[in-house]
Amino acid sequence: MIQGKTKTGFVYQLDDNTMNNMELVDAMAELDDGGHPFALSRVCLLLLGKDQRKRLYDHIRTEDGKVPPQAMGEEIADIIRGFGEQGKNSVPSPE
């Protein structure tokens, strides 16, 4: 289990094999290519699951009740960077 916190203070947990999901990779590639903007919602769901996605929405929700896509993109990028950093620092388990 990988645990982390974004720059804005959102605390999350990801399974070690979260990135080992071709559907997530496809959705991330679609975002990266400037493709369909709805891919961000799919990336968030595949990365965090329903409960954590709801918590993240509430975390970045504005006073008028909206969840800004720009803020969501920044949070997701921060989570993915954190996942990569923890992955580099993890110790492989003995076989």
For each feature predicted by the language model, list its residue ranges:
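Short acidic, Pro/Gly- and aromatic-enriched capping/linker segments at domain boundaries
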Residues: 1-5
